[in-house]
């Protein structure tokens, strides 16, 4: 049915039909509001944490396996209380059907081939699964990705009249090349029977709830454990946000949005870095070849959600134009 009809597919996904703060969006820089924020701070960012990689049928993603002394913790999140801390949990890389327009967000209607999304969750919760439905439970740091050798631009690209030095992220390239090959096939292990029960229900039961978020009680009992289980592969090298972040981490845009895949909960503070990074063409190709839940390569349809139109989303920037 496609992203436009996600809210009609499953009763846990009704938030996908909201028009309040759904993601992704086009960031119109002329309409952003300047606001000073303290610098983002990441504790233990130089540590490589234990991780696995899975293919959930939508896209492959790296998942952190935490130990108490190895948590990578994000602080000074814009528009969130200063005391709040968020644990690094996942790394996703999105791409589209069009090789040049694979990022989910756009800046002044310009896309990049891919977009890296680092997911952090509020430490008040046990894990990302519990936090993602909770108010202000998640923070996602987004970095646009170019492909080495495919861009006509030089390493220095003009961004809003200023220059970004584009970092070639060698370690991320190697991780993508190696581990996207391992999860190329879609390896479904099991599926929660609750999910199949909902699919068999007459859809009119929840059609009229499109745009409304399910109750906390419903989410806890019916939604939090319904995702299919898939085979994990151990990432021997581990991961760190340093694999992904651009040279310039001082300039970003931020807004209150949502998850970009079902259940689309509106619980995310997005931080979109102004400057991109660059990965190898082989890394890009390995991602394109990963299978989705229909056993088609991701390059056929892509995994990016279309831009969303919201009623009142304010985008802030922490830098002068």
Swiss-Prot record:
Primary location group: secreted
A GO CC term assigned to this protein in UniProt: extracellular region
Catalytic residues as annotated in Swiss-Prot or TrEMBL: 58 (proton acceptor)
Tissue distribution: Component of the organic matrix of calcified shell layers like nacre and prisms.
Superkingdom of origin: Eukaryota
Keywords: Secreted
Molecular function per GO: carbonate dehydratase activity; zinc ion binding
Domain Alpha-carbonic anhydrase as annotated: residue spans: 1-319
InterPro entries associated with the record: CA_dom (IPR001148), CA_dom_sf (IPR036398), Carbonic_anhydrase_a-class (IPR023561)
Subcellular locations according to the entry: Secreted
Secreted found in the keyword field: yes
GO biological process, one term: one-carbon metabolic process
Family stated for the protein in its record: Belongs to the alpha-carbonic anhydrase family.
Protein name, entry field: Nacrein-like protein
Organism: Mytilus californianus (California mussel)
């Amino acid at each position: 049915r496609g992203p436009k009809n996600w809210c009609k597919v499953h009763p846990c996904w009704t938030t996908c039909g909201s028009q309040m703060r759904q993601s992704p969006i086009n960031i119109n820089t002329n309409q952003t509001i300047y606001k000073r924020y303290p610098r983002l701070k990441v504790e233990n960012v130089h540590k490589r944490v234990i991780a696995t990689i899975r293919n959930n049928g939508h896209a492959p993603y790296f998942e952190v396996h935490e130990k108490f002394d190895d948590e990578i913790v994000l602080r000074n999140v814009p528009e969130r209380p200063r005391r709040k801390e968020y644990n690094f949990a996942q790394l996703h890389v999105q791409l589209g059907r069009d090789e040049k327009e694979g990022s989910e967000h756009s800046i002044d209607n310009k896309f990049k081939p891919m977009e890296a999304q680092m997911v952090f969750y509020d430490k008040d919760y046990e894990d990302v699964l519990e936090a993602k439905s909770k108010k202000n439970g998640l923070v996602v740091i987004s970095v646009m990705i170019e492909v080495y050798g495919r861009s006509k631009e030089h390493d220095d690209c003009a961004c809003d009249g200023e220059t970004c030095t584009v970092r070639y992220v060698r370690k991320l390239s190697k991780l993508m090349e190696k581990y996207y090959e391992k999860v190329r096939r879609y390896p479904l292990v099991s599926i929660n029977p609750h999910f199949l029960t909902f699919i068999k229900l007459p859809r009119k039961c929840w059609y009229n709830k499109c745009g409304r978020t399910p109750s906390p009680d419903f989410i806890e009992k019916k939604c939090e454990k319904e995702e299919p289980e898939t085979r994990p592969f151990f990432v021997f090298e581990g991961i760190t946000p340093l694999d992904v972040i651009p040279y310039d981490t001082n300039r970003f845009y931020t807004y209150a949005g949502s998850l970009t895949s079902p259940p689309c909960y509106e619980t995310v503070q997005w931080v979109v870095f102004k400057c991109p990074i660059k990965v190898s063409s082989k890394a890009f190709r390995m991602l394109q070849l990963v299978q989705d839940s229909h056993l088609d390569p991701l390059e056929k349809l892509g995994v990016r959600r279309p831009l969303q139109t919201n009623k009142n989303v304010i985008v802030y920037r922490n830098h002068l134009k």
